[in-house]
Amino acid sequence: MFDIFKKNKLGGNGGENLYVNIGALLINVAKVDENYSEQEKEIIKKTLLELGLTKTDLKDVFKKSEEVEKNSNQILEFTKEIKNKDEDFKIKIVEALWKIIYADGVSDMYEMSLMRRLTGLIYLDSKIVGNIKDKIKNSFNK
């Protein structure tokens, strides 16, 4: 059985559904620019592991995340559980989202629009989001 029902590093019993939804959200953002790269997939997998998913469960959860994202028509369902998590958890998600956006070296208006909607849905202060964006963008420009 899945080990992901154990307490994750950031507190609370995450459960499989949380990780699948986070993965689906990250995949959705990665696909917005119609360039879903291996680098983006690696960022998504690394993020899931950093949030407490075990290596044993990564393959299955990632596959389910891709299926859920493919069969979904709105991002709201991916953010329901995230919005109730603590700020540190949300910051890790937003950092991963910006890493995915800047992985190809550019950001477009669709990615920016999606980020504004997402950060509103998870209730994270826009100043924090802006600081994270600048930090990630600068790390890719080095």
Where do the model's predicted regions map?
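Small-residue-enriched hydrophobic alpha-helices in membranes
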Residues: 1-28, 37-142
